[in-house]
Amino acid sequence: MTALDIIIMAAGKGTRMKSRIPKVLQRLAGRPLLHHVLGQAASLQARRVVVVTGHGATEVEAACAGLAGAGGTFDLKFVRQEPQLGTGHAVQQATPALAGDGTVVVLSGDVPLTQAATLRALVEAGAGERLALLTVRLPNPTGYGRIVRGEGGTVQRIVEHKDANDAERAIDEVYSGIMAVPAQRLAGWLARLTNDNAQGEYYLTDIVSMAVADGVPVAAHCIGDALQVAGVNSPAQLAELERAHQRAQAAALMEQGVRLADPARFDLRDDARSGARGEILCAQDVEIDVGCIFTGRVELGEGARIGAYCHISNATIAAGAVVHPFTHIDGEKAGAHVGEGALIGPFARLRPGAQLGREVHIGNFVEVKNSTLADGAKANHLAYLGDASVGERVNYGAGSITANYDGANKHRTVIEADVHIGSNCVLVAPVTIGAGGTVGGGSTITKDTPPGGLSVARGRQVSIANWKRPAKQAKG
């Protein structure tokens, strides 16, 4: 493959999105559209990528900071198109930043689903000497530039929809907005562009007729999958591509043997907070019920079962673990781990730094954050464990909490092995509960407790016989 530079068109306003966010920063699978296209550039091992910005340029450029070479080795540059005078004008702004040799591929920043294999085939069709166009046949080509062919089926020109006559509008083969151009020819063709058309713009597509006039072969690489070249101009189109993308990811998982209760109700997304790409690694016999969302990098061990409507981010679920419905596991940057055979939920919440051992039970409305629970520990109802180290076989009662924050600093609670914590207890950190000990229900523990003992810290019960409740006073 010849040396490759890429221009990405990202100057459009996206008026139909009705959003303050620039169109190319709208998210698909948790990642901005433009990031998907930059990923395509990385897959082609591009030498240099030039992003043409316009509306929201500052935001777009900031959103791409640090992405140069992500998954590849390209040099990332930005140029601004002000004002926006058409696609040809946009490429004119970018060419000074290119090396001037090899092949230049032009991509659209709002076309996120083009496959790397498709782009490689397009580049090969151009071979550094021909002008290669990526085309597709559409049942309703309204709004797209038509591919006009001459005798023998050779491409003669592209005519934009607004400039097309009735015969040309009947053509169903359309230009996708993606092309591969011999770099040494590009500057000369751009210099000959005019804006003598219905839009009063400089069309990049006019270089096709110039190539024909100059005797440069024009190749059309026509694909059958229109979703690969579908752009985003409205929330409805974004939703359509989101579902197409998620269906493809679901299909790939099922090919690996994962049981999805309903592939139409499965989502895998990037994590914008940690920067982790959406990736799910599944062992054999994994089952995922409906409505689950996976964010960032998630590993599911052999026989793991995920109940309906769970949200799992940056976490590892070990073999045989069961996550019951409506559970939220969010490892964020610190990660979260659920051990083999553990039972989680329903309605449980594991936060960053939650590390659960084998056969741990975390029940409904229990929250665990930055805490380690050793094998066999249980917190089955309505409890909070934050900044805690919990030993083996601990039973942590309903309504109990670790008071880990003093208003300025976090402190740890240590609960040693075989401890029984009664219901509605408060463990005020820093504090250690000795091995085998018991804390009586309703206690507020502020000091370390000895191993094997019973610790009770609560007001003494007082019962008053024959006590009369206050009576309501008569009104008026």
UniProtKB/Swiss-Prot annotation:
UDP-N-acetyl-alpha-D-glucosamine binds at residues 23, 81, 86-87, 108-110, 145, 160, 233, 351, 369, 384, 395. This is Bifunctional protein GlmU. One of its GO terms (cellular component) is membrane. The active site is at 381 (proton acceptor). Its EC number is 2.7.7.23, 2.3.1.157. Mg(2+) binds at residues 110, 233. One of its GO terms (molecular function) is magnesium ion binding. It is found in: Cytoplasm. The gene is glmU. PANTHER family: BIFUNCTIONAL PROTEIN GLMU, NUCLEOTIDYL TRANSFERASE. Catalyzes the last two sequential reactions in the de novo biosynthetic pathway for UDP-N-acetylglucosamine (UDP-GlcNAc). The C-terminal domain catalyzes the transfer of acetyl group from acetyl coenzyme A to glucosamine-1-phosphate (GlcN-1-P) to produce N-acetylglucosamine-1-phosphate (GlcNAc-1-P), which is converted into UDP-GlcNAc by the transfer of uridine 5-monophosphate (from uridine 5-triphosphate), a reaction catalyzed by the N-terminal domain. Its main location: cytoplasm. HAMAP family: GlmU.
